From Swiss-Prot:
Transmembrane segments: none annotated. It comes from Bacillus subtilis (strain 168). The gene is yybG. Pfam families: Pentapeptide. This is Uncharacterized protein YybG.
């Protein structure tokens, strides 16, 4: 892969969370239930009890230890600061309470649009996908324009229709990338949408596998070769990636990596960083 694509100067900033410029939207707008990922129940539109008056989290450095693994794994792809600073022009929901409910409805729509942009941006950085870069760029610019619509128009968007269009080009990108892998004889159970909860996949050659939407919860992927593998939408909570090689894998988000376990020997693509909780 290369990082040659610069659709505008702040692309990397725009597509990653900047909590300092957000009104704590993920901590308010989104609901969650008490579980292994969250320490207590919270309704959508209700501020988390850990959200401070400055919109920062009081336990941010200790989220996993305090029972909020779900928060540590969440990624808004920059939607939070876009809604806070651009869509609502810096007017926060506490000082402008009449905007609160609408803002909380706009945020998840923006998050989905920014997620699409993140995937498209990655596709545009892949040299092997150059034959379709023109179409990818056109699609990126179309979705990016949607993110700058008014709050009223954002609420009327048919997000699923736009996601279907984006997915068409992401699928083509995936096919181009995975075709470059030496195709080993993959286990039959390893395929798109596979249920691989707790699966024993240690040390397997899974290069070029299509793991789109696969359930990899607590899967043992230690020392597995996962190069040029498509991870889009895969649930990787508690998957063990210790010693695994994921270089050249595609559509692997920081949220997925944060939800998994690994170690200093895990090789990750350049688009994500090693989580602090990995040993």
């Amino acid at each position: 892969m290369s990082a040659e694509v610069t659709l505008h100067d702040n692309i990397h900033y725009d597509l990653s969370a900047d909590c300092q410029h957000c009104f704590g939207l993920c901590c308010v707008a989104l609901p969650y239930a008490k579980s292994a990922d969250f320490a207590f129940d919270k309704d959508g539109g209700t501020p988390c009890r850990n959200l401070q008056s400055n919109y920062q989290c009081s336990i941010h450095k200790d989220l996993r230890e305090k029972g909020f693994r779900g928060c540590s794994a969440y990624e808004c792809f920059g939607a939070g600061q876009k809604v806070s600073q651009i869509t609502y022009e810096g007017k926060d929901w506490r000082n402008s309470p009449e905007t609160a409910n609408q803002m909380f409805d706009v945020f998840p729509i923006m998050q989905q649009l920014h997620e699409m942009l993140w995937y498209l941006h990655e596709a545009l950085s892949i040299d092997i996908a150059k034959p379709i870069h023109s179409e990818l760029r056109t699609t990126f610019e179309k979705i990016e324009r949607l993110t700058r619509l008014s709050k009223e128009r954002l609420l009327t968007l048919q997000v699923d229709e736009h996601r279907a269009e984006v997915n068409e080009w992401l699928l083509k990108t995936s096919e181009l990338v995975r075709a470059q892998a030496r195709h080993p004889k993959l286990p039959k159970k390893v395929s798109r949408g596979s249920v691989l909860i707790g699966a024993k996949l240690k040390g397997l050659d899974l290069r070029g596998a299509n793991l789109r939407g696969a359930l990899l919860i607590a899967a043992d992927l230690r020392n597995a070769d996962l190069r040029m593998t498509d991870f889009i939408g895969a649930d990787m909570r508690d998957a063990d990636l210790s010693g695994a090689d994921l270089t050249g894998s595609i559509f692997l988000t920081q949220a997925q990596v944060n939800a998994a376990n690994g170690d200093s020997n895990t090789k990750l693509p350049l688009s994500v960083r090693t989580p602090a909780h990995w040993k």
